[in-house]
């Protein structure tokens, strides 16, 4: 952290060699990995070009895939781009890969309201 600045005020230097996950809107509960994450890697969460937090990868997360940005209980909507893109089929821990093994689609299903 830069002296005199809170974590929320830090501006991201794109040349910095830190692992980053991009949160696209304040409403999202998942972010996009900007490089491969190995289990145990610490990553910065970036929103609007600023560091808003850090987390640790609980699983491997490949470049371009989604990471949970907080604990997501089963049945909770998965939100990316401020839109629901699915629903958690099981509990998802913060820092875990979010993909077809732990989410289910909600579009075009006649059994959901």
Regions found by a protein language model. Give the residues of each.
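Short, Lys/Arg-enriched N-terminal segments with co-localized hydrophobic residues
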Residues: 1-15
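Conserved "landmark" site that anchors the functional core of diverse proteins
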Residues: 11, 102-107, 112
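Extended boundary segments
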Residues: 16-57
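Short alpha-helix capping/helix-loop boundary micro-motifs
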Residues: 28-31, 63-65, 83-87
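Compact, glycine-rich, soluble single-domain proteins
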Residues: 47-80
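C-terminal structural segments of small proteins and small subunits
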Residues: 85-106
């Amino acid at each position: 952290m830069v002296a005199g600045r809170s974590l929320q005020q830090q501006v991201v230097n794109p040349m910095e060699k830190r692992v980053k996950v991009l949160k696209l809107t304040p409403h999202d509960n998942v972010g996009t990995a900007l490089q491969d994450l190995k289990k145990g890697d610490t990553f910065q969460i970036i929103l609007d070009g600023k560091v808003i937090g850090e987390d640790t990868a609980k699983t491997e997360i490949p470049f371009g895939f989604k990471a949970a940005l907080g604990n997501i209980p089963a049945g909770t909507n998965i939100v990316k781009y401020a839109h629901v893109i699915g629903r958690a089929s099981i509990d998802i821990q913060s820092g875990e890969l979010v993909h077809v093994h732990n989410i289910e689609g909600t579009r075009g299903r006649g059994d959901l309201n």
